[in-house]
Amino acid sequence: MVEVANMWSLLLLPLLALLQIPGAWCWNHQERVLLRDIQAITLYADRYTNARRSAPVPQLKCIGGSAGCHTMVPQVVQCHNRGWDGFDVQWECKVDMDNSYRFGKVEVSCEGFDYPEDPYVLRGSCGLEYTLELTEEGRKRSQDGYRSGGFGSGYFQSNSNSWDTKTNGSSAIVLIVIVIIAYGVYKLFLSGPSVQEHPRPDEYGYDFQSQTRASAPPPPGFKSDFTDPHLCKIFGASKSFSSGYGTSHSNQGPGFWTGLGTGGVLGYLFGNRRAQPYQAPYFNTWTGPSNSDSMHQNYRPPQSSGVRTASGFGGTKRR
């Protein structure tokens, strides 16, 4: 009995293998399509092709062109078989497109079923590679837009805005430091004293108020106290300090008076900055915020003349 069972198992195994062959052949037959028999294919921007020997690829793939790949992205393209040139299928691909754009080079790419040059291809493996070009109308719109700061200048403006964002932190720190320095200079040299001191006669009988020698007017923005002769007394200097300043300090480096000059310049600059009127930014919906007077004109971006069905012609590429 054991020998009979073994004999039947040996006979059944080949039969089971033969029964699976038609199923595999049917599956391959359904997925294996003669390229010349394909009459039309519909391709979508958000889908990938089928794949068997290689990796899937996008059904619609832009590979360049004068218009760039991001200005207009077709969502659905349909390609029709227009004949056989003796080597491969020739295609006409159509899509609804703005009048500013057109197809350049188009090429349908399909995966050979067993090898790249196989006349049979995998069903659903075809995709489209194309270039996107500007029409004459598109070139005119592009030139008009660049003159006015629109139609493509958003890319450069967004880059400059991102650069400004990166530098805002360091600029704010520098501005804060300058404001602190200017405020310190202002409080130290330019603001009035909190306690008004009355002049006193010199211990040796010399009264500064009794002197009749005229002194030069103080520089703009400074208190007269800093040029008054009592300053010598306050800082412990002798009467001859001011008369000998030109000779005794002409060869010395920057000191107290240099600091005063620097404070005056900073005070002038910040005062001039505060005196400038504020100009509110003008927001242009085409190019973004701007302070330029030219942008206050009633500018409207150039409008397209409409949409049409654009066609592109090309052959087949195998992979």
Curated annotation (Swiss-Prot):
Pfam families, per database record: SARAF (PF06682)
Q: Which family does it belong to?
A: Belongs to the SARAF family.
Which InterPro entries has this protein been placed in?
SARAF (IPR009567)
Where is the protein found, in the record's own terms?
A: Endoplasmic reticulum membrane
Signal peptide range equals 1-26
> For the region Disordered, what residue ranges are annotated?
200-221, 292-319
Where along the chain is composition biased (Polar residues)? Answer: 292-308
- Could you tell me what this protein is called? Store-operated calcium entry-associated regulatory factor
Chain ranges sitting on the Cytoplasmic side read 193-319
Which BP terms does GO give this entry? Answer: calcium ion transport; regulation of store-operated calcium entry
Q: What is the membrane topology noted in the UniProt record heading this document?
A: Single-pass type I membrane protein
Q: Which cellular component, as a GO term, is one annotated location? A: endoplasmic reticulum membrane
Where the protein is mainly located, per its record? endoplasmic reticulum
* The gene coding this protein: saraf
Lumenal domain ranges by topology: 27-171
Transmembrane region(s): 172-192
Q: What does this protein do?
A: Negative regulator of store-operated Ca(2+) entry (SOCE) involved in protecting cells from Ca(2+) overfilling. In response to cytosolic Ca(2+) elevation after endoplasmic reticulum Ca(2+) refilling, promotes a slow inactivation of STIM (stim1 or stim2)-dependent SOCE activity.
Q: Specify the domain of life of the species encoding this protein.
A: Eukaryota
Keywords (A to Z) from UniProt: Calcium, Calcium transport, Endoplasmic reticulum, Ion transport, Membrane, Signal, Transmembrane, Transmembrane helix, Transport
